[in-house]
Amino acid sequence: MKIKYLLLIIISVLITSCSSNQAMKPEDFKNQKPRLIIEEYLSGNVKAWGILQNRSGKVTRQFSADLDGKWDGKQLILDEKFVWNDGEIQNRQWTINKIDEHNYEGTAGDVVGTAKGFSYGPAFKFEYVLLVPVKGREMKITFDDWIFMQDERVAINRAKMTKFGIKVAELTVTVSYTHLTLPTICSV
């Protein structure tokens, strides 16, 4: 009986690991529109609102964020200010370099090593390890961070956070490009 359960567990692990090859890839979006050019979209003032969910899906925190990006033709400097619903304020400054049409690299003070970015069509994927404060200490959390352009003003950001390959949390963010002139929908 124990051997059957062990065999079932081994088969489940093998099936799960094989199915991970079918994971979403940035290249899957190469022929879709609108095209997200991250250095253009994040240049200027951008506003974001999001939720943090624990591994079981329960919303544990909410935030709003102000992003201010400056692109010099080679490098994007992105200042982020997060205001959490519990009053915590977090600041991060990203330095993002465009390597070629589809590849980016980024660094920030609380990012371990170099983040890798990939851009195709309306999708931008950012992979990095972030030092996250948890109960008085810092934990290394791996981010699988996706931004999907919806139109010229709005993008949706989903980030899966893992530790040792196990999902620990997920972020869902709505991003709005605030320095475009919006059409007037009613007049007085």
Explain the meaning of each model-derived region:
Residues 1-7:
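Bacterial N-terminal signal peptides that target proteins for export
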Residues 29-45:
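N-terminal helix-cap/turn-to-beta initiation motif at the start of protein domains
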Residues 107-164, 170-174:
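Mature, soluble, non-transmembrane domains
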